[in-house]
């Protein structure tokens, strides 16, 4: 084998497409764009949501509802999590919940929900409570304070 015998692997060197260079090139005259029409033009891009001139789907469907700018978004914590992570008579505050990574972030505060059972009394300070959570906290001798 000599240096002049070396050739690139078949299929690795793709020939450049030279458009508009006569009929013999296979891409002459219209350069592979067909005859006239939007896609034959210089900036003939058709957006994916274009439906050929008919009224698009997002305009055919009615507008519904709205976003309530005053909506409160609470980080939720269930009673069963408090049972696992806190000792009896311990104070549960939003700062402690963040510190122990029980909640990631508080947008408008913390809401305690009533899923699970509670067996030890806790002093829970949160921004909101569900009815079942309030009952469970107070039934075991704990206190629920809205802050």
UniProtKB/Swiss-Prot annotation:
On subunit structure and binding partners, the annotation says: Part of the 50S ribosomal subunit.
InterPro entries from the xrefs? Answer: Ribosomal_uL15, Ribosomal_uL15/eL18, Ribosomal_uL15/eL18_sf, Ribosomal_uL15_bac-type, Ribosomal_uL15_CS
Spell out the Basic residues composition-biased ranges: 30-44
What the entry lists under Pfam families is as follows: Ribosomal_L27A (PF00828)
Source taxon at top rank? Bacteria
- The protein in question is named Large ribosomal subunit protein uL15
One GO CC term on file: cytosolic large ribosomal subunit
UniProt keywords, alphabetically: Ribonucleoprotein, Ribosomal protein, RNA-binding, rRNA-binding
Homology family: Belongs to the universal ribosomal protein uL15 family.
Q: Which GO terms describe its molecular function?
A: rRNA binding; structural constituent of ribosome
Annotated segments matching region Disordered:
1-57
Function per UniProt: Binds to the 23S rRNA.
Which GO biological process categories is it annotated with? translation
